From Swiss-Prot:
Protein name listed in UniProt: Tyrosine recombinase XerC
Pfam families for the chain: Phage_int_SAM_1, Phage_integrase
Organism per entry: Rhizobium meliloti (strain 1021) (Ensifer meliloti)
Gene: xerC
Boundaries of every Core-binding (CB) domain copy: 17-108
GO MF term (any one): DNA binding
Role of this protein: Site-specific tyrosine recombinase, which acts by catalyzing the cutting and rejoining of the recombining DNA molecules. The XerC-XerD complex is essential to convert dimers of the bacterial chromosome into monomers to permit their segregation at cell division. It also contributes to the segregational stability of plasmids.
């Protein structure tokens, strides 16, 4: 069954028209101004929809802006408690609270609410989970061009280029698919990347990544303007993450890789293998585009046996 679209989501959400109108504007701003990924925006849409439904039951009627303005920390804790009772884990609850804080801050900036109540609620403590990195041998299998399963050469080259950017440069999948010809216009050994929140960083581009992208661009049948995304779907539209995720599923089956071998696992592998090769955390933080060093520090806990296996080698694709 297909997930509900935006119109159905509006019908499912319960709130006064003035609240729903502001919510639509806020969601649009997340994608257009803050450049959050489609996945994050969809998650925030679900979280706020569930919160409005909770408030409707809590207030015995669809909430108005005045009700949102009068929210207390206890109201938010009650919502989180209900979600926890329904089986939501700490990560889901933390993301939900982050979405509500974002919505309330948006309303506060527009003089429509007070976000202090959300700020007074602590985020659930997140369990430490270690990245599931591929071995260097597994990662190389994935990014090798002749391992791609697509019948058309340009699509096989496209898939190989995207996956090589994830592993060879540590990009998020959304960052790779947003790349334009202009992002490659600097030195041949560097790449301009626009990450979360619209923040730009310059990352080194190893030869294998540069060659993979160049091969794709030579084979791609579509004309691409300097400010347009370079990676295209079969019909010429911007390539969507789901296509690369499906390609990775096929590669997993063909190469006998574990279920943990996902596009994002290639980014984890980039960081893990660099750390094992002697890279320092601060540099890896900058390469990954992490706002906080604490986010990067999770790589120090990666299985020591895996690190020892590749200890004396630098990045395998360098």
């Amino acid at each position: 069954m297909k997930p509900p679209g935006p119109m159905m989501n509006e019908l499912l959400a319960i709130g006064h028209p003035e609240v729903m109108a502001e919510r639509r504007r806020w969601l649009a701003s997340l994608a257009e101004e803050r450049r959050l990924s489609e996945k994050t925006v969809d998650a925030y849409e679900r979280d706020t929809r569930q919160f409005l439904t909770f408030l409707t039951g809590h207030l015995a009627g669809p909430p108005r802006l005045s009700d949102i303005c009068a929210l207390r920390p206890a109201d938010l804790r009650g919502f989180l408690a209900q979600r926890r009772k329904g089986g939501a884990g700490a990560r889901t609850l933390g993301r939900g609270l982050a979405g509500l804080r974002s919505f309330l801050r948006y309303l506060e900036r527009n003089g429509l609410a007070n976000a202090a109540g959300a700020g007074a609620v602590r985020s659930p403590k997140q369990p430490k989970s270690l990245p599931k990195a591929l071995t260097d041998r597994e990662a190389l299998k994935v990014v090798t061009a002749d391992a791609q399963l697509a019948e058309e050469p340009w699509i096989a080259a496209r898939n190989a280029a995207v996956l090589t950017l994830l592993y060879g440069c540590g990009l998020r999948i959304a960052e790779a698919l947003d790349l334009t010809p202009a992002d490659f216009s600097g030195p041949v050994t560097s790449l301009r990347v626009t990450g979360k929140g619209g923040k730009t960083r310059i990352v080194p581009m190893i030869a294998a990544a540069a060659e993979a992208v160049e091969t794709y661009r030579k084979l791609c049948p579509y004309h691409i303007e300097p400010e347009e995304p370079i990676f295209r779907g079969a019909r010429g539209a911007k390539l969507q993450p789901a296509i690369i995720q499906r390609e990775m599923q096929k590669l997993r089956a063909a190469l006998g890789l574990p279920d943990s071998a996902t596009p994002h696992a290639l980014r984890h592998s980039f960081a893990t293998h660099l750390l094992a090769g002697g890279g320092d955390l601060r540099t890896i933080q900058e390469l990954l585009g992490h706002a906080s060093l604490s986010t990067t520090q999770v790589y120090t806990g990666v299985d020591s046996a895996r690190l020892l296996e590749i200890y004396d080698r630098a990045h395998p694709r360098a």
